Amino acid sequence: RPTTMVIKDSVRHYYPIKQGQQLDIMFTITNTGDAPLVISDIQPSCGCIILDKNSHIIIPEEGIRQFKATYNSIKNIGEVVHRIRIFGNMLPDGKAELTFDVNVVPDADYTRDYEELFQEFNAKNGIVKEMVDGKESELGYYVGTP
């Protein structure tokens, strides 16, 4: 049976954080209807958001439940906007959404680009030798006309 719900502060603007920091987001869902609220799924818009939740959640009539999401900013710089979608038996169309934005500030000393991060990752995992001593047909570039 459908019910109604409210997400407290469903649109949020967080203060800037430094790249690499994690942002813990607590959100509160209140079942304002007269039937149990059955949440069948909670989906973040990005793999950088980890949810602390069960797969199937029931909130009784007039009940309140808090959820925690953790945003990892390691791969972002600048203004980011993310959404957390909630699916269940809520009116009017079975879905609700929490939206948040935050400005991820790079380290003031130096900002590494993607190639440097990729090279650092490969060096830690022992892949550099394979990249340097690869086969001639696997160099990743060509000379002359294609």
Explain the meaning of each model-derived region:
Residues 12, 55-57, 63-69:
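Short strand-edge motifs at loop-to-beta-strand transitions and within beta-strands
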Residues 72-78:
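Short, surface-exposed loop/turn segments at beta-strand-coil junctions that are enriched for proline
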Residues 1-21, 28, 91-146:
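Long, low-complexity ectodomains and other extracytoplasmic segments of secretory-pathway proteins
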Residues 79-90:
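A short beta-strand micro-motif common to beta-rich folds, especially ectodomain repeats
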Residues 29-33:
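Asparagine-centered strand-capping/turn motif at beta-strand->loop junctions
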Residues 34-61:
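Surface-exposed binding patches on compact interaction domains or structured appendages
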